[in-house]
Amino acid sequence: MPSLKEIKNRIASVNSTRKITSAMKMVASSKLHHAQVMIENMLPYESMLEHILKTFLASEADAQNVFTEEREVKNIAFVVYSSNSSLCGGFNANIIKLLLQTIEEYTHLGKDHILIYPIGRKVAEKVEKLGYRSAGDFTNLADKPNVAECIDIARQIGKKFIDGEID
């Protein structure tokens, strides 16, 4: 049977853990609120962009470019987003589960024909562990996304598609 001192230490430990958990909950709540505000501020731009694109696409119905042509899939690329931390394990687990389900559809191509752009440390670690080809290290984008690096990734993917390296 534990002594009185051990019981008091255990109670103090549980209380300390409760305080830490409460602080983490407040930080997560603050980050969630900030993300919600950012999304709400972006919605008017998204609807205007959608309107512009629909108008453009309706007026150019016969427009053809290299990205609209259909071709046999021999090489495939995935852009996969995850977090850099473990504080959202369900999110990361679901992302990785979906990635693995999607890759399953293309296993007949072989690992050498699957290229993954891992954005976030958790997915980058999983890609490396499973032995798939990674297009680079984009872990910093998960914490601090920026337009310049996103454009670089889009250009890389576009160039690889045009050059026939991915389908």
Give a label for each model feature.
Residues 2-167:
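Conserved loop-to-helix interface motifs that mediate assembly, gating, or partner/ligand docking
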